[in-house]
Amino acid sequence: MKIKLTNSTMVKPLSLRPTTNLWLSTLDIQMPTDYHVPTLYFYRFTGGADFFDPAVLKAALSRAMVEFYPIAGRLQMDNNGRIEINCNGEGLLFMEAEADGEMGDLGDFGPKPELGLIPTVDYSLGISTYPIVLLQVTRFKCGGVCLGVGYEHHISDGYSAIHFINTWSDIARGLNITIPAFWDRTDLRPQSPPNPRFTHIEFHASPQIKTPQNDTNHSDAVPHETVFSTFKLTRDHLNALKANCKDEDDDGKAITYSTYEVLAGHAWRCVCKARGLPENQETWLSIPVDGRFRLQPPLPKGYFANVIFTALPIALCGELQSNPLKFAVGKIHNAIARMDNDYLRSAIDYLELLPSEIDAHSRGMHLFKSPNLLISNWSKLPMYDADFGWGKPVHMGAGAIPPDGITYVMPNPTNDGGVLYALSLPKEQMELFEKLFNDI
């Protein structure tokens, strides 16, 4: 399938505010530069000549950016070399395109970066030259539409990104803004001077694989064919996992584990086994945790920023395999429970003390490669509420194939109580993972 670009516009706010610079917290500036997080929304054609009318979308976008004004700005470096947002109202990129095939030709709507459903920019020109948000509406021969979104992570996490997209869609339907954006990041400043109270191992170097260098099954030097798969777990599957995790605390009271905790425990065990890791191999599970309602006092509902911290259960691969599922699930439960106000405030201070050269790139993707894993929980996000007036999306998901070790729990679009689990693994590992994961 080929995509042909038909129009490109820089959409600006309907009205401009005085130019200001928005300070970014340490949670913001740790995000990688020169990268837009890609997501895709797919909509089936519902009839009518005005289906996904670009004029309607752009008019609503202009109105939305009055409230979400930093999104129309540009990244820049302040006098101390720290990233901030210049709220100059230059706007965001809105592109239109046509596909020579039908939406059904895409199959399961998995990531297809080769098609070009999301705009690209030239990062070599510097952080102040490209928009913070990139949008592309692609029409298929069947009438269906893909909305591709590229989102610069310095401005916020996924919770806030979806807040913006859903507010834009509400305005397109003629609704008023129900949750105003809250931009003041003062609540995320470190103490002066910073004084972390905990040792934050989540920012330390990750464990190395305990295999000989000539073991090509785990060597980064040997290319492996990576495959992406999405697995559906029904309500019955999830209930079966929970039934296998009945547990009690030290006082004999029953512990209730969440859907995410039991799924993450199951996935962690299966990935370690599929990778063929030795029993004495240490493995880290990175769990992104939203701090909005864990910090005290809780942050405002429309708090627009990166407020994601990392819970980090650690185990030996042999422990995960020799113990019942509730062993892994209990480690996950306890790591998440630890993420209270004191721990999160300490993490902010700890990040502030890290040398500036230890950025997201040097701390980043290696934390999630074998023997480690990251499981992001998107299952509670209102991903399917982006109705621009022509119905809700039939699919919303990642626009690029995630690297090995970065995985997602997502809501099922049918809202039937099940969830989806998406991940990438080397082909030979994926085949074994599928057998293990489906054995519930």
Cite the ranges covered by each PLM segment:
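Short, surface-exposed beta-strand/loop micro-motifs that present aromatic residues
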Residues: 30, 132-138, 403-412
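Low-complexity, glycine/alanine/valine/leucine- and proline-rich hydrophobic stretches
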Residues: 365-440
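Soluble acyl-CoA-dependent acyltransferase catalytic core bearing the H(X)4D motif
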Residues: 2-20, 33-383
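An N-terminal structural lobe/cap that precedes and organizes the functional/catalytic core
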Residues: 22-24
